[in-house]
Amino acid sequence: MADIKVAAYICKGCGLGERLDTDALVKIAQKDGKVPLAKSHEFLCNADGVAMIKNDIANEGVTHVMIGACSRRAKTEAFFFPENAVARANLREGVIWIRPDTDEARETTQEMAEDYIRMGCAEVKAMTAPGGNPNTGSSKTLLVVGGGVTGMT
């Protein structure tokens, strides 16, 4: 099994940078998540952000990617890296959208985001990078079973 190298990327877009201390989240990923490479970006889902991740995959040997940004259901095309294990920490919908935007709630919101980063780092480390089974070949044929009218509607 090849060595794994984990990288964490924290997005500042979509209100994340205004509500959270993203530099502190980068430090949490490095210290508590034990991630050797952690960075933040203004908008991870734009071309520059995706290029930064792809560059690290190509040049730094990153095999596992943890993205702290929006929901794993959003921006799936932007964060599709077929050769790498990818985990998403849902900071937008899971943290800042459900917490009040008040001074009293700011500290607990930050703590919640830090927990999400810790969980994302732990999740991606437990993943196996996709690669298929090297012992079997691939096949382009498909068998459809039960393709009746009920299954088509």
Residues of each region from the PLM?
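Residues forming the flavin
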Residues: M1-T153
